[in-house]
Structure formats: structure tokens, C-alpha cells
């Protein structure tokens, strides 16, 4: 058996804080709260829906053109 008693380790860990009620999970990240300590962030500049679709369409057309060129060169 050990020569040390359990009472000697009582000071190693602080006592847990007294609970004032049930645990409530914090809101998800990005969820607006009443906390005003954070600095306001400038709004992010976004593209309109047409501009984003235009880039996607150009990418698809470029890919199709590259496939056609490769197909013509190989066969």
C-alpha cells in the first residue's frame, strides 16, 4: 500500500465551480449574438449571380474546346 493518503492530493486540483443551472451550448459560429465587444467587419464584396455563372460557363466551354482539340489531334 502507499504511504500517502488521499487527503494529501486534495489541493492538486481546484474544486469545480458551482453550477448556476444546466449547461447551455454556445451558438454556432457566425450566429449573431448580443455581444458588442467585437469590432465590426467591413462587408465582403460579392459577385452577382450572373457573373459567377459566366465564369462557370466559360470554364465549361474551354474544357469542351480542349477535349475537341485533343480528339481531333489524336484521331
UniProtKB/Swiss-Prot annotation:
Region annotation Disordered: where it falls in the sequence: 1-29
A Pfam family of this chain: CYSTM
A GO biological-process term: cellular response to hypoxia
Keyword Nucleus appears in the UniProt entry: yes
Pro residues bias spans: 14-29
Membrane topology: Single-pass membrane protein
Keyword presence, Repeat: no
Transmembrane segment boundaries: 52-69
Tissue: Mostly expressed in roots, stems, rosette leaves and siliques and, to a lower extent, in flowers and cauline leaves.
Induction / repression: Induced by heat in roots, but suppressed in shoots. Accumulates in response to cold, drought, oxidation stress and salt.
GO cellular component, one term: nucleus
Keywords: Cell membrane, Membrane, Nucleus, Transmembrane, Transmembrane helix
Coiled-coil intervals, chain numbering: none
Cited InterPro entries: CYSTM_dom, WIH1-like
Localization, UniProt: Cell membrane; Nucleus
Subunit structure: Heterodimers. Interacts with CYSTM7 and WIH1/CYSTM13.
Function summary: Involved in resistance to abiotic stress.
Family note: Belongs to the CYSTM1 family.
Stated name of the protein: Protein CYSTEINE-RICH TRANSMEMBRANE MODULE 5
Lineage: Eukaryota, Viridiplantae, Streptophyta, Embryophyta, Tracheophyta
Gene coding for it: CYSTM5
Amino acid at each position: 500500500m502507499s504511504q500517502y493518503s488521499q487527503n494529501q492530493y486534495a489541493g492538486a486540483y481546484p474544486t469545480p465551480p458551482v453550477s448556476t443551472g444546466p449547461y447551455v451550448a454556445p451558438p454556432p459560429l457566425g450566429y449573431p449574438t448580443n455581444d458588442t465587444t467585437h469590432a465590426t467587419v467591413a462587408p465582403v464584396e460579392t459577385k452577382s449571380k450572373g457573373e459567377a455563372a459566366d465564369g462557370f460557363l466559360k470554364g465549361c466551354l474551354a474544357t469542351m474546346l480542349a477535349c475537341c482539340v485533343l480528339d481531333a489531334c489524336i484521331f
